Amino acid sequence: MEDQVILVDENDTEIGVEGKMIAHRSGSLHRAISIFIFDSADRLLLQKRAASKYHSAGLWSNTCCSHPRPREECARAARRRLREEMGIACELDVKFGFVYRAVLTNHLIENEFDHVFFGRHDGDPVPNPDEAEDWKWVDLAWLRADLNERPHAYSFWLEACIDRVIACREEDRTRVA
């Protein structure tokens, strides 16, 4: 049976479920999660999506992204997928949500209400090769500059939210100081 995604309205109110590929072909708005893991040096862990992924293959992206299953809370889905994709277990905090829509190169449509989580982890990930073919720790200022120079090398959703991610990190540092 095909994986299901949770259909939502613009307020993130659940309105149904649909097959994942059907939702991505039709452009149905559905719930998603994006995880950003930082180390103690405040570097962000990026993953390079596996060449076998059904969309955005071979692109650099945030640490982990996926969809919660029907009846699964976003926080639980985020912890589950972070372990499955990158072999990391850590505390995650939800930071914000945003909606984005993009028509991808293979005519699939990303139309997601994305819940963004931050976590902290020091050490190397153990990526699932079906999900990620490479990884690296990067400075956020470097990433912002590289996204400006080479947007084609990154996932659309990373570009869509990176400025808000950077602003949240600045707020977090200000609160701690």
Swiss-Prot record:
Gene3D superfamilies: Nucleoside Triphosphate Pyrophosphohydrolase
Domain Nudix hydrolase per the UniProt entry, residue ranges: 28-160
Binding sites annotated in the UniProt record for Mg(2+): C65, E85
UniProt pathway: Isoprenoid biosynthesis; dimethylallyl diphosphate biosynthesis; dimethylallyl diphosphate from isopentenyl diphosphate: step 1/1
Catalytic activities: isopentenyl diphosphate = dimethylallyl diphosphate
Cofactor: Mg(2+); Mn(2+)
Locations listed in the record: Cytoplasm
UniProt KW keywords: Cytoplasm, Isomerase, Isoprene biosynthesis, Magnesium, Manganese, Metal-binding
Gene Ontology, cellular component aspect: cytoplasm
Entry's cofactor comment: Binds 1 Mg(2+) ion per subunit. The magnesium ion binds only when substrate is bound. Binds 1 Mn(2+) ion per subunit.
Top-rank EC class of the record's enzyme: isomerase
Active-site residues, Swiss-Prot/TrEMBL: C65, E112
GO annotation terms (biological process): dimethylallyl diphosphate biosynthetic process; isopentenyl diphosphate biosynthetic process
Database matches in Pfam families: NUDIX (PF00293)
Molecular-function GO terms, alphabetical: isopentenyl-diphosphate delta-isomerase activity; metal ion binding
InterPro entries referenced in this protein's UniProt entry, alphabetically: Idi_bact (IPR056375), IsopentenylPP_isomerase_typ1 (IPR011876), NUDIX_hydrolase-like_dom_sf (IPR015797), NUDIX_hydrolase_dom (IPR000086)
HAMAP family xrefs: Idi
Family: Belongs to the IPP isomerase type 1 family.
Function of the protein: Catalyzes the 1,3-allylic rearrangement of the homoallylic substrate isopentenyl (IPP) to its highly electrophilic allylic isomer, dimethylallyl diphosphate (DMAPP).
Entry protein name: Isopentenyl-diphosphate Delta-isomerase 1
Species per Swiss-Prot/TrEMBL record: Aromatoleum aromaticum (strain DSM 19018 / LMG 30748 / EbN1) (Azoarcus sp. (strain EbN1))
